[in-house]
């Protein structure tokens, strides 16, 4: 069954989320290796963003305690606290949750579009490292399909906002950004989003990054209203400008009290990284805003999009039901094919016996074959129709198992394509 353990802005604070975050691929790989050793876990992947850590798996039976214990040991967190905080979803609940995440209905900023790319990256990593198989491939592929439907059939992502845009909107409430210089620390996806929103607000941006070439490349994309420098010169910039937006993947804080000098004017720090980049004391001239502090702006966004969200949840509910109908169809179609194949094999075998014993002339072989095939097709028509009527119904599994036993189809099914998955697990072909 499908299984999901979720830690988000809804059930954990930023301090706990930053402990749980997978800031590098090595940590993610280590965790997935640990949990994939469990006998009940067949496939798994991890989605880790500034607002969530999601463990999505395909399992034989529930195993939340093992997964949470493994996460607690790796991240040095109390297991009981995690079990108390975790939202756990099983089977249809897990698929509904995954579809909601992919469609940005479960995001801190409803309608933001970053999560689709983050899910894509999480899936690609799991496939590349052999943690993900056909079951999660189906689920993620369907999640992308659902997200596309939500985007196309609702206005949920129209004028969509992100954590980056919310941070800049908050800065605009504090001061006029026109012609001001704002420092953006980090040249990754989030840093680029912040820079674009700042430029749109009339500001000029300075990109600081450890990899100078990456900062230069970003500035070339941004245009004349940007400049760049090395992160080594961070202290100089911290004590020269008013607005700072930090979005790095650093494992520990990079802006600390030791870098801050007392100045006569106000400075505003926006920390949109998890783990947090900023660990400084606030005073009358220094204000720090972390991801969770942007909740007020987010709530305004939710109110504006409430009607669209209801429509989107309707789509997600229907797509969840459709997904499980699809799974039932995959199970039924091989049964129908196997029965027809078995009938054809028996008919051909008896035809050859009849020819050998002289019951039938060789010249009549093809006509006899056509007649026999028409007979077994007519005979199997009603069973085939009845099986197809079971598609998507609860009793389908019971009937499938009975048919497999009655017709001894276990071996016959091995050669058939039971999955019809558009993702080739051997060649790592993309489905997104």
Swiss-Prot record:
Location of the active site: 50
Record's catalysed reaction(s): (S)-4-amino-5-oxopentanoate + tRNA(Glu) + NADP(+) = L-glutamyl-tRNA(Glu) + NADPH + H(+)
UniProt KW keywords: NADP, Oxidoreductase, Porphyrin biosynthesis
Gene Ontology biological process: protoporphyrinogen IX biosynthetic process from glutamate
Enzyme class, spelled out: oxidoreductase
Entries under Pfam families matching the protein: GlutR_dimer, GlutR_N, Shikimate_DH
Residues at which substrate binds: 49-52, 107, 112-114, 118
InterPro entries assigned to the protein according to its UniProt record, in alphabetical order: 4pyrrol_synth_GluRdtase, 4pyrrol_synth_GluRdtase_dimer, 4pyrrol_synth_GluRdtase_N, GluRdtase_CS, GluRdtase_dimer_dom_sf, GluRdtase_N_sf, NAD(P)-bd_dom_sf, Shikm_DH/Glu-tRNA_Rdtase
Superkingdom as given in the UniProt entry: Bacteria
GO molecular function: glutamyl-tRNA reductase activity; NADP binding
EC number: 1.2.1.70
Keyword NADP in record: yes
Functional pathway: Porphyrin-containing compound metabolism; protoporphyrin-IX biosynthesis; 5-aminolevulinate from L-glutamyl-tRNA(Glu): step 1/2
Site for Important for activity, residues: 97
Residues where NADP(+) binds: 186-191
More info: During catalysis, the active site Cys acts as a nucleophile attacking the alpha-carbonyl group of tRNA-bound glutamate with the formation of a thioester intermediate between enzyme and glutamate, and the concomitant release of tRNA(Glu). The thioester intermediate is finally reduced by direct hydride transfer from NADPH, to form the product GSA.
Subunit relationships: Homodimer.
Family: Belongs to the glutamyl-tRNA reductase family.
UniProt xrefs under NCBIfam families: hemA (TIGR01035)
Summary of the function given for this chain in its UniProt record: Catalyzes the NADPH-dependent reduction of glutamyl-tRNA(Glu) to glutamate 1-semialdehyde (GSA).
UniProt-listed HAMAP family: Glu_tRNA_reductase
Domain-level remarks: Possesses an unusual extended V-shaped dimeric structure with each monomer consisting of three distinct domains arranged along a curved 'spinal' alpha-helix. The N-terminal catalytic domain specifically recognizes the glutamate moiety of the substrate. The second domain is the NADPH-binding domain, and the third C-terminal domain is responsible for dimerization.
Protein name: Glutamyl-tRNA reductase
Annotated organism of origin: Campylobacter jejuni (strain RM1221)
Upper taxonomic lineage: Bacteria, Pseudomonadati, Campylobacterota, Epsilonproteobacteria, Campylobacterales
Gene this chain is encoded by: hemA
